[in-house]
Each structure stands twice: as structure tokens, then as C-alpha cells.
Amino acid sequence: SLNTDLRKVLFGKMTVSDISGEMSVAGGVLSLDRLGLGVFGGKATASGSYSTAADPAKPALKLNADIAGASFQKTFEELEMVQKLVPIFAKTGGDYSLALDMRTSLDSQMSPDLQTLTATGEIRSANIRVQNIEAFDALAKALNNDDLRKIEAKDVTIRFAIRDGRITTQPFDLKLGSVGINLSG
């Protein structure tokens, strides 16, 4: 068992700061218990495990995390999995909070194997801004309504699941200019 207090850790492009909590190692399993950390411009708590017990070539990761005040853009810049699964984060402004329960195998680069990734969660944001999306720009031009070029949403909650490398969401509401829309899928 190890009580952790680390100021800054670099993991690929991701910077993790102010790590504190308890870690233990036994039988090829690193367990994390209520680890606190700074990530993506916000604060997080995480519990879970990293295991090489079953297959050292494909470590298993189990993670339960709660993140508050994180930046959409910082998350996109720092996390390759988000670049692959949620490319719209590159064009999204604002901060979010996230509750996540995730299971996956890791590849040789310590990245999640998207074919083994399963997760459920909920992302919440008080203010989301999405712009420079080609489809919405074309719609705005066709309808001669520049308000349609950007999506803005307040107090959004999106429940989602990830299976077989695909994200699905339960229905949620956004505004496209002054037009309300309901999305899911």
C-alpha cells in the first residue's frame, strides 16, 4: 500500500497534477482507491484497477471517475481516445463534469483497445458552445440564417454508453440558434 502525493505526472500528451490518494499492488494488480487529481483543467476523483494478472500483454483497466470543471478542448488535446471517439470536442468550448464507469484492455501503447472498451456515464455542462461544423455552416447558408452556424446549450446532461468502439446517447436537448433540437443516437 502506498499513500500518494505527486505534484505533476506526464502521460503522453496528458498532464495530471496534484495526485493524492491510496494505491496498492498485489498479485499483478495495481488498485487505486479514491485518488484525487487535477486533469483537463478540472479536478477528479478516481477508483479502479490496472491488472496484468490475466494477460501481461493486454493489461485490463477498470475505472470509476468523477471529473468536475474540465475543459472540452483540453480533454481533446490531451486524450487520444477522445480524439477518436468524440472528435467534435475539438470544436467545443466550455467546461464539463463527468461521471464515468469504464472497462477496457490496453494496447502496447497503453491506450484503450476500442474494441474491448465498455463504459457508461453522464456528462454535464452549464454552457456548451460548438461552432465551425461544416454541416451546420451549410444549413445556415442554405437557410440564410447565421444563427444556425453555432450550437449553444445551457444546463445540458447527456447520458451515454460506449460499446464496441461506438458511443450512443440517450435523448438530450440543444439549441441551434433560436431553434430547439432533440438529439440521441
Segments predicted by a language model, with ranges:
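Small-residue helix/turn framework positions
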Residues: S1-T15, S20-G185
